[in-house]
Amino acid sequence: YDDPRLDALVEQALEANANLRAADANLRRADAVVREATGQKTLGTSVLADADLERDYTTTSAGTNMPGVLTYDLGFSVTYPLDLNGKLKRAIEGSLADREAVEAARDAVRISVAAAVTKAYADVCAANYQQATVEKVIALQQQTLTATTRLQRGGRGTAFDVSRSRTAVETSKASLPAFTAKRKAALYLLATLLGKPPAQYPADVESCAALPRLRSPMPVGDGAAMIRRRPDIRQAERTIAGDTARIGVATADLYPTVSIGGGIINDGKLENLGKTHSFGFSLGPLLNWSFPNRPVVKARIDAANAQVEGDIARFDAVVLDALRGTETALETYARDTDRAAALGSATSSAGVSSAQAAKLFRFGRSDLLSLLTAQANLASAQVN
């Protein structure tokens, strides 16, 4: 729309909207999960430090107890997962896909917020525009009422003409409160979208009376292109990818996990701390295999497969709904464009007819009903 005031409102809403803050928090959580999954492929380290007092309660030949001995254990070990079964790789893929799904959900919230702000802003401007238009028509009808009253007093009109003119004025005035209510409702919604109480709506928007206009045709492209841009489609697709990766995570438990590790150990009596003969080391593969629990692992695999099947069904439903919504929106946009062009022509024609009817009535060439009808047609065309 190239409207700086509208752009500023959208920016404020994107910063302050509570739903968007929650979506941003979900994205930060997904980032943390990705870091956690990626960190599983790095070196693991552990440190051991232990000290004990060992006492032998046997007695010597002299009848005294044996003295206690202080011992210690110090160790440092390093392990690195080889990921031969691909479990860590699939876990990372799943977390990345989950993050992309959360990001798509956040994008959907952003689009919804921007669209809601734009609609609320347009509703305020439209309500003011419609009210101003009706007030102009009321002014014309008031002039007609004044003229018919003057004609009646001069003996050239009837009380019926005056009552019909007054009815037209009052009928038009009766529509004004509806525009006020529509404007207030849109302002309250706008305040809520900006993260404020309804009464704290932006005061400068309240007086907006110029309808937002597209500066260029909407770049809709075709239906397929619009669907590819939809965040709900991306979210559903990335959800499938994440849950598919978790099938690999569950399947990997059917096979052993292998790590390579090594460590340095220093233990013995405290007085030997640091001496060469108290050091030792270890190096080799570490094997872990849950083969006794294979039925449990297979159950997890079945559950993961069922989850993906459900995701695919939901994806199909989302795509069908997106196709319906996209085609409906494109058709509505095209027909609204045609309707706007027709209403523009109708408004111009109604304006000419109203002016002609007023002139003919003034010179006694037309009756009052024709004038009131022309003015009503003008009001309807302008409001639409």
Go through each PLM region and give its residues.
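Transmembrane beta-barrel architecture of outer-membrane proteins
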Residues: L6-A8, T71-D73, K119, R164, ...
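Charged, alpha-helical scaffolding/interaction elements associated with membrane systems
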Residues: A16-N17, G154, R229, F363
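Amphipathic alpha-helical coiled-coil segments
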Residues: A22-A37, V109, V113-L145, T149-R150, ...
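Compact, aliphatic and Gly/Pro-tolerant "microcore" segments centered on a short helix or tight beta-hairpin
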Residues: L43, L48-L53, Y57-T148
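Small/polar, glycine/serine/threonine/aspartate-rich low-complexity segments that form flexible
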Residues: Y1, E11, D50-S77, Q200-P219, ...
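A glycine-/polar-enriched beta->alpha junction
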Residues: Q12-R21, R28-G44, G75-E93, A104-I111, ...
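Repeat-solenoid scaffold signature
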Residues: R153-K182, N384
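Short, solvent-exposed, mixed-charge loop/turn linkers that connect secondary-structure elements
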Residues: K136, R156-T158, P177-I227
